[in-house]
A protein has these predicted regions:
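Conserved interdomain linker/interface between the two RecA-like ATPase lobes of SF2 helicase motors
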Residues: 2-75
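Conserved segment of the helicase C-terminal RecA-like domain
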Residues: 151-157, 161-195
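Short, surface-exposed amphipathic charged segments that create phosphate/polyanion-binding patches used
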Residues: 23, 38-41, 111-113, 187-194
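Conserved nucleotide-binding/hydrolysis micro-motifs of P-loop NTPases
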Residues: 12-15, 28-33, 78-79, 102-103, ...
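Long, largely alpha-helical accessory region at the distal end of helicase-like NTP-driven motors
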Residues: 61, 65-66, 70, 77, ...
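Signature of the SF2 helicase/ATPase Hel1-core->accessory helical subdomain module
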Residues: 1-21, 137-157, 161-170
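Conserved helicase ATPase core of P-loop NTP-dependent helicases/translocases
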Residues: 72, 81-84, 92-132
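A general structural motif
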Residues: 68-70, 121, 171
């Protein structure tokens, strides 16, 4: 089973110190005017000014390893990627959006700019799914997830964009904005490698992740995120 094999490889690679350590923060996505971000959230809610400011505050708070940020931000819709990139740029960042319509030349230029340390180079690339696998950007030192977790495979692939070792970073920061998503239970499955879907083990991992994860990596969930994941575990068939 490919899903199981992929997760076992991640766990073993971490144990053998083959990957860059990561610090994962599962934090609550914003509630806007009593609307909780979920799988069916309206586009306008996802690009609300207050949410953008909240996201920027959090990615600044949690930071990165190195002299400057080299970040990837995964979102759920192409329109969202383009709009959020515009809004970040209005707030002083240098970002771009890459979707499936981008040419190979555009992708390569964006990746080269994200890797660069020169003035004017990209701080972030917003994308939906084209960076899930097969992309090598070793300097990535921050990954933000602004989308539902639809499978443990995709979660690990997106996390993996920051796990290449590089002498300009000691670790990668992963910030997962957790809404009230139906499939939040995939988060502990992906991070723990627990493929038998034992609900008690998944709950324990969410509560005690730092005690279980191999190597120097750490995992933290805030209390509301824990409750949302526990709820998804309880409702999962």
């Amino acid at each position: 089973d490919y899903n199981i094999a992929y997760e076992i490889r991640l766990q073993q690679a971490m144990e053998y110190d083959l990957l860059c350590p990561f610090h994962y923060y599962g934090i609550t996505d914003m509630t806007i005017d009593d609307h909780v971000i979920d799988d069916k959230s309206d586009f306008n809610l996802l690009v609300d000014e207050k949410r953008v400011d909240y996201v920027i505050d959090k990615i600044n708070d949690y930071g990165y390893s190195g002299d400057r940020v080299h970040g990837l931000i995964f979102v759920s819709r192409k329109e969202e990627a383009h709009r959020l990139s515009e809004m970040f740029n209005q707030r002083g960042f240098n970002t771009c959006a890459l979707t499936g319509e981008a040419t190979e030349k555009q992708r390569q230029e964006a990746m080269d700019s994200l890797e660069s340390n020169e003035d004017g180079s990209l701080d972030y690339i917003f994308t939906v799914d084209i960076f899930n696998e097969g992309i090598d950007i070793p300097k990535v030192n921050q990954v933000a997830m602004l989308r539902p977790t639809q499978s443990s495979i995709i979660f690990i692939q997106q996390l993996g964009r920051g796990l290449r070792k590089n002498n300009e970073k000691d670790y990668v920061v992963v910030i997962d904005f957790i809404g009230n998503y139906e499939k939040n239970f995939f988060i502990p499955i992906a991070l723990s490698g627990n493929t038998n879907f034992n609900k008690d083990n998944l709950r324990r991992f969410v509560s005690e992740g730092n005690l279980i994860i191999p190597g120097a990596s750490t995992i933290q969930f805030d209390e509301i995120s824990k409750k949302r994941i526990f709820n998804a575990i309880d409702l999962a068939k």
